[in-house]
Amino acid sequence: MDQFSGGGGNWSMIPNVQAQGNFGTPTNHDQQLFLQQQQLQQQQQQQQQQQFHLQQQQQTQQQQQQFQPQQQQEMQQYQQFQQQQHFIQQQQFQQQQRLLQSPPLQPQSLQSPPPQQTMVHTPQSMMHTPQQQQQLVQTPVQTPQQHQSLASHFHLYPMVEKLADVIENGTRDQNSDALVNELNSHFDKCQQLLNSISGSLGSKTMTVDGQKRNVEESEQLLQQRRDLIVEYRKSIEEIVTMEH
């Protein structure tokens, strides 16, 4: 210390101590550490966000996978129903084609034993007057137009003409009896065929109506599930946008 003497006494001067380091200003090393910490924090935040998005995507995929098997089953059921309808329509069309295009049946031989006698070929019925016999013969001919194909299919018109000739002549023999029996058997076959066709058509219409109702119900269920899936996706998208 330097001493000075003055009027008021001795004065001593305190030397200035210079600061050897700047403690207030950060160094480059501190700045690098700070930047590294910030980068690590940002990376951790990004990783957390990515993990969160991955979890959400996995959840959506799992939920979609749960809905997909149900949709596939419903589509398979709908396709099977369409195939069944197509098959039924094909069967109906084939039956109609067979009725129209099948080869004619060979007439039975006149020497074949007659089947069970009906009211037409009993002895009493054959003893009627020619007018009554003509009425009995003409009644099967007056069938509706829709049955004309069956009559032509079984070759009924020639036999009816032959029977009319026999009745007009008034002669009765084995040939006329066999002709009457053959005609009756053919008409019985026609009646059985018509009954079977009408029964099959009625049953098929009932099954088709029931299948149509099942298809409508399955379509309604499919539409409801589609709407639910769309709403679920919208809600997930809204949640993701809100978090961003």
From Swiss-Prot:
Composition bias type Polar residues, residue spans: 13-28
Primary localisation category: nucleus
Biased composition (Low complexity): 96-111, 122-131
Coiled coil residues, start to end: 212-239
Domain of life of the organism encoding this protein: Eukaryota
Protein location: Nucleus
Biased composition (Gly residues): 1-10
Cellular component terms (Gene Ontology): mediator complex
Function, as annotated: Component of the Mediator complex, a coactivator involved in the regulated transcription of nearly all RNA polymerase II-dependent genes. Mediator functions as a bridge to convey information from gene-specific regulatory proteins to the basal RNA polymerase II transcription machinery. The Mediator complex, having a compact conformation in its free form, is recruited to promoters by direct interactions with regulatory proteins and serves for the assembly of a functional pre-initiation complex with RNA polymerase II and the general transcription factors.
Protein name: Mediator of RNA polymerase II transcription subunit 9
Species classification: Eukaryota, Viridiplantae, Streptophyta, Embryophyta, Tracheophyta
Gene name of the record: MED9
